Amino acid sequence: MEIYANADASDMNLTRAAAKIEAQGYMRWPRALEIVRFAKAAGFSHLGIAFCVGLAEEARRYRELLEKRFRVSSVCCKVCGIPKSRLGLDQIRPEDPEEVQCAPLCQAEMLNRAGTELNILIGLCVGHDALFTKHSSAPVTALVAKDRVLGHNPAAALYSQYWRKRLLSGDGVP
């Protein structure tokens, strides 16, 4: 309780908005709508979307929905166009010297400069989402967590007998 007694006004605003949306939308609204309602309840007017190029269509559709209510800035993961080979990074296709790295630091910086008040992740890679969150000046929430194997539904691994067994046994886990 003491941590909330010492929370700043911004944190308490987010805490109240989150509780309000949880109470009103519990088991009623999809996450896409919860984010809209949360942003409104928190008093935000400028939202950011950091998205994976592989989910560009989903990001476009969500941006379209958000633009009816907010100012929106969005940034694709490949924004800086830096080849992985220049930084000595592992590549998906080692034969391609121009394979471009994802750039969560650039995404965060661009949305910071745009002055977004809440940033929404759409399918950033594991690790890239952590870097983006670390460097974002605004609070961050996720609409889509990338999972190429399970249709961007990572919780399915916990419900699926097959994947749960593999995860528990360490099969395929280095």
Predicted regions and their residues:
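Short glycine-rich or small-residue beta-strand-to-loop segments that form or flank ligand, phosphate
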Residues: 39, 43-53, 74-76, 118-122
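Short, acidic/small-residue loops that bind anionic groups at enzyme active sites
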Residues: 71-78, 131, 135-153
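Electropositive, gly/pro-rich neighborhoods at or near active sites that engage anionic ligands
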Residues: 1-46, 53-57
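C-terminal functional extensions of proteins
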Residues: 141-174
